[in-house]
Amino acid sequence: NLYQFGNMIQCTIPKRLSWSSFVDYGCYCGKGGSGTPV
């Protein structure tokens, strides 16, 4: 869904952002971890 897509996009952004921990979580495309970590 759109929320998951947004998280996948955030995975490509450098982790120097203040919410980098959320970016790391987003790399798994949500709670199910259905995506591939980047």
Curated annotation (Swiss-Prot):
Family, according to the entry, reads as follows: Belongs to the phospholipase A2 family. Group I subfamily.
GO terms, biological process: arachidonate secretion; lipid catabolic process; phospholipid metabolic process
What is the annotated localization of this protein? Secreted
Q: List the top taxonomic levels of the source.
A: Eukaryota, Metazoa, Chordata, Craniata, Vertebrata
What's the catalysed reaction?
a 1,2-diacyl-sn-glycero-3-phosphocholine + H2O = a 1-acyl-sn-glycero-3-phosphocholine + a fatty acid + H(+)
Alphabetized InterPro entries for the sequence: PLipase_A2, PLipase_A2_dom, PLipase_A2_dom_sf
* Reported tissue expression: Expressed by the venom gland.
Gene Ontology cellular-component annotations? extracellular region
**Per its Swiss-Prot or TrEMBL entry, what cofactor is needed?**
Ca(2+)
Tell me which domain of life the UniProt entry assigns to the organism this sequence originates from.
Eukaryota
Q: Does the keyword Secreted apply?
A: yes
Which residues make up the binding site for Ca(2+)? Y28, G30, G32
Concerning SUPFAM superfamilies, the annotation shows: Phospholipase A2, PLA2
* An annotated Gene Ontology molecular function: toxin activity
Could you tell me what the cofactor note in this record states? Binds 1 Ca(2+) ion.
**What keywords is this UniProt entry annotated with?**
Calcium, Hydrolase, Lipid degradation, Lipid metabolism, Metal-binding, Neurotoxin, Presynaptic neurotoxin, Secreted, Toxin
Summary of the function given for this chain in its UniProt record = Snake venom phospholipase A2 (PLA2) that inhibits neuromuscular transmission by blocking acetylcholine release from the nerve termini. PLA2 catalyzes the calcium-dependent hydrolysis of the 2-acyl groups in 3-sn-phosphoglycerides.
Ranges in coiled-coil conformation: none
| Record keyword Calcium present | yes
The protein, known as: Phospholipase A2 1
Annotated EC = 3.1.1.4
